[in-house]
Amino acid sequence: MPRVKRGVTARARHKKVIAAAKGYRGRRGNVFRIAKQAVMRAGQYAYRDRRNKKRTFRALWITRINAAVREQGMSYSVFIAGLKKAAIELDRKVLADLAVRDKAGFAAIVQQAKAALAA
């Protein structure tokens, strides 16, 4: 069986890692052993933060809704309870968007929630 030299394969593998580390500072961008670790860590951060992003955005939407609802003289938790009672099935993303872009429309939804709680 002939001897297999791995020069081509190794070079391709190294190039792939170095390309992934493009833009990294210092030796993290041009030394294979260090770049490999940096790329792996970057992947771990990306994996973790794809999950954290969902939490962060939900928190942002809730904060925006709460601020807009308090202008109408209500708290967030009472507002959400009113929406449930009024059978309004808008998610927090849409509610936050309405609160920012369409204040009159959002105020109408708040009034419906208030009416449902009063009934």
Swiss-Prot record:
Gene3D superfamilies: 6.10.160.10, Ribosomal protein L20 (1.10.1900.20)
Gene Ontology CC annotations of this record: ribonucleoprotein complex; ribosome
Lineage, broadest ranks: Bacteria, Pseudomonadati, Pseudomonadota, Betaproteobacteria, Burkholderiales
Protein name: Large ribosomal subunit protein bL20
Family: Belongs to the bacterial ribosomal protein bL20 family.
CDD domains per record: Ribosomal_L20
Keywords recorded for this protein, A-Z: Ribonucleoprotein, Ribosomal protein, RNA-binding, rRNA-binding
Example of a GO biological process term: translation
Organism whose genome encodes this protein: Bordetella pertussis (strain Tohama I / ATCC BAA-589 / NCTC 13251)
Top-level division of the source organism's lineage: Bacteria
GO MF annotations in UniProt: rRNA binding; structural constituent of ribosome
The keyword RNA-binding is assigned to this record: yes
Function: Binds directly to 23S ribosomal RNA and is necessary for the in vitro assembly process of the 50S ribosomal subunit. It is not involved in the protein synthesizing functions of that subunit.
The keyword Ribonucleoprotein belongs to this UniProt entry's keyword annotation: yes
